Amino acid sequence: IYYSMFGFQRIGDLAWMAGDMQARGFLLGGTAGRTTLAGEGLQHQDGHSFMVSGTIPNCVSYDPTFAYELAVIIQDGMRRMYKEQENVFYYIAVMNENYQQPAMPKGVEEGKVKGMYLLQGGGKRRKKVKLRGSGTILREVI
């Protein structure tokens, strides 16, 4: 776990080295997104780490909002790295906001690992709006 004040770029050389070495493990970058620690200045608002982490082929990146998402991601990472023996490492953004953690909806595990799942349906209205979000902004989206 590291304080990602300036984001993934701060540890970029180490991340590339981990990729080249085929390292396995988890990097948890604290203070994710552009919404946390806004009062401390823009340098504390990491909004670009996923652009940088996406350039490393064996770096798997996630921006979870809820604790159950983090549990699903870590469980899948352990399976991939240690059972399947894949040479991947994970970058996971975590945040420092305190809020109510919901129970995990049934059947979201596969969608979360793939990158998207339906958190709640919109009902049976004819016109629908599809909202997407992750990480620090998801609570405002819902």
What do these predicted ranges mean?
Residues 47-50, 56-57, 70-142:
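Glycine-/acidic-rich phosphate or pyrophosphate-binding loops and their flanking alpha/beta elements
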Residues 1-2, 60-63, 131:
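Short catalytic-loop micro-motif centered on adjacent basic/acidic residues
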Residues 28-30, 61-65, 93-94:
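General beta-strand structural signal in soluble alpha/beta enzymes
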Residues 1-57, 68-75, 79, 135-137, ...:
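Thiamine diphosphate
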